[in-house]
UniProtKB/Swiss-Prot annotation:
Its main location: cytoplasm. It is found in: Cytoplasm. GO terms for biological process: regulation of DNA-templated transcription. GO terms for cellular component: cytosol. The keyword Ribosomal protein does not apply. Belongs to the TACO1 family. It comes from Shewanella oneidensis (strain ATCC 700550 / JCM 31522 / CIP 106686 / LMG 19005 / NCIMB 14063 / MR-1). One of its GO terms (molecular function) is DNA binding. This is Probable transcriptional regulatory protein SO_2432. InterPro entries: Integrase-like_N, TACO1_YebC-like_2nd/3rd_dom, TACO1_YebC_N, Transcrip_reg_TACO1-like, Transcrip_reg_TACO1-like_dom3, YebC-like. Keywords: Cytoplasm, DNA-binding, Transcription, Transcription regulation.
Amino acid sequence: MAGHSKWANIKHRKAAQDAKRGKLFTKFIRELTVSAREGGSDPDSNPRLRIAIDKALGGNMTRDTIERAIKRGAGELEGQQLETIIYEGYGPGGTAVMVETMTDNRNRTVSGVRNAFSKSGGNLGTDGSVAYLFTKRGVLSYAPGTDEDALMDAALEAGAEDVVSYDDGAIDVFTEPTAFYEVKDALDAAGFVSDNAEIAMIASTKAELDAETAEKFMRLIDTLEEHDDVQEVYHNAEISDEIMESLG
């Protein structure tokens, strides 16, 4: 979003909605379970699991609950079998949207995702239809007031790819996925604690939306995120701070 950290408005809005709907713990447990199943139960050798653990702890999930989810994923406890499926589509204003889901029922999930796109005036695409517009990168976000020069020096020395500052003082540090925790640990040790840290799909091009289109687009995002099987939604929409504020 213009002059503002790409993640700030929609991420904060999303987190508030997730908490309000009581969905955060469900999402944490699913991510912990699938991460452990696909990459093993040791977070030191499974970066995806380590990120999931950090997010769960940040959301006040108990270590006991986290451990049970990991054991379930590793096959030490019984539980539902989930698989990760990525859906791609086009939203209002020609926006590119990627929807990461975890499900035990493909038919239920694809039906819900397709319906969300259709209701917003968009359409669900085929595999690869928008994926080429996104690159997987690590993102570390820092609040306004952070010493930009010191953070940039520390980040680049630690192996970050890029450091982007915004008009309001917010800063994003971008990394290769494989270097994410090396950079994060170095910055943590240097006293730079991020507001948000994740490996995400970053769009290479943006679609700027006017107020009317932005309202339709956010309705699509809300509908997708209300679906129990949806874990993350990535997109290339560019929405100004003023429009985001008007949307609430």
